[in-house]
Amino acid sequence: INSSFGNNANNRAEESIGSAFDAHTAFDEHLLGSSSIPPVMGYVMIVHDCPDSRIVGRGVRSAHFPIDPAFDGASDLDRFLLLCDRLRRKSLYQAVWLVFANPEDGVAYEPSALLSYDKFIANIVMALGVHRA
């Protein structure tokens, strides 16, 4: 994600949650074949780490529902971290990898050990092992 961070955060949240829900529902309704083991799903997000994505407290508002306090005063990078952590904790995806990268200086980093490449690969391999057993 490289621009329009606020809009992109909302769109990526809707897409990632919706896609996971659709896949889980398709499995529950036996639309993915006869397997009794749910599909293995991973989610990868790479976000541009730049001054715009680090702005804290960008106005988050809702006309209909209260805003989760975790988002109060959060930068867009913080919001992406919250999204990816919740996708993992809620088991919407078996593996989630989050990277913040700045192509101008070549620096990339993983903001959470639980959302690292190593954990992503380990979780995918483990989940696929269940399918192969």
PLM-predicted stretches and their roles:
Residues 99-133:
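Charge-rich, low-complexity intrinsically disordered segments
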Residues 4-101:
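Acidic, metal/cofactor-coordinating or nucleic-acid-engaging core segments within structured domains
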Residues 1:
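A glycine-rich, hydrophobic loop/mini-helix early in the fold
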